[in-house]
Amino acid sequence: ASGDAERAELIAAAQQLQWRNKAISDTYEPGSTFKIITLAMALEEGVVDMNSSFYCGGSTSVLGRSTPVRCWKSGGHGSQTLTQAVQHSCNVAFVNIGQRIGEERFYDYAEAFGFFERTGDSSAQLTGTTGIDLGGESGSIWWSEDVFCNPENLSQLAAASFGQTFNITPLQLITAVSAC
């Protein structure tokens, strides 16, 4: 009988070790859910308003990128208002919005939203956490400032504008959206 109790205890301990709180321990590319953050940055900076319009032909060229950034709708959305660009989740419109914000301001906002903390080394890849008092919290994965803010290569800004090529935890995304 004592063997059964020990075995049950070992199984319980092993299961506990396997448990992870994925909201804080795993990072993901946020994709289109990040467009809320980009939109908040743009509205705050006054680079877009409810009268802004965008044209989506299905793709757009970006300085420093050999292939165009494509919208999920290959034929494009055509002319659209800001509201329609959000409703359509249009990547091309959000690349344009990101370019209006600019790489330096976008980077500053990303830091202000808590996705990373600058270290003083502009060539360092950055991470950030929410500071939640739970074990196992992972940090985000962001570009170095030198790479992101390179005016001759805006591909990172373009991709970040619609939530690609960086990783954050679900809790970081929820925290940032709550601040919008």
State what each model feature region is.
Residues 1-32, 37-180:
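Beta-lactam-recognizing serine transpeptidase/beta-lactamase-like catalytic domain environment
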